[in-house]
Amino acid sequence: VGKPSRYNEMLLKAMNVQPNETVLDIGCGPGTFVIPLAQQCHAVYALDYSQGMLNMVQQYKEKHQLNNITLLHKSWSDNWDDVPQADVILASRSTLVDDLDDMIEKLQSKAKKRVFLTSVTQRHFLDEGVFEAIGRDDVGFPTYIYLVNRLYQKGIHANVSFIETESGHFQ
């Protein structure tokens, strides 16, 4: 789905999903990872808060004749009692949440084996000169280190690695 990217290739390789495994892709968007994962594993649960994104996943699902994809219309703040557990959890670029502790609890309750999270390493997605040009403060987002520190405080020793994107930034 979409154009090939180094980020996508590196993340899929790192995940090393096996044919007998299930995957929960949280914040799946249009199916960037859902489709290639469904082609290599037992089942994929595609979770997104946007019905429009899930509609796109449905279109790709039909186009590629993949019957092992289940769509879940949820957000991080919803009740996840009916979200199935999966061997592998992926939350790619979808970890900027209001309640980090709730997110971590949901990940822990749904993951059977492994969790892959990606987060920004830069405080924002725009060039710093943009903020100066428009006369606004460069406030930005919390970076990956906030997430790593919170995991550590909860006794989770995350294995952290970086993927350089086409823009030269790391994720």
Per-region residue spans from a language model:
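Conserved class I S-adenosyl-L-methionine
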Residues: 1-16, 20-29
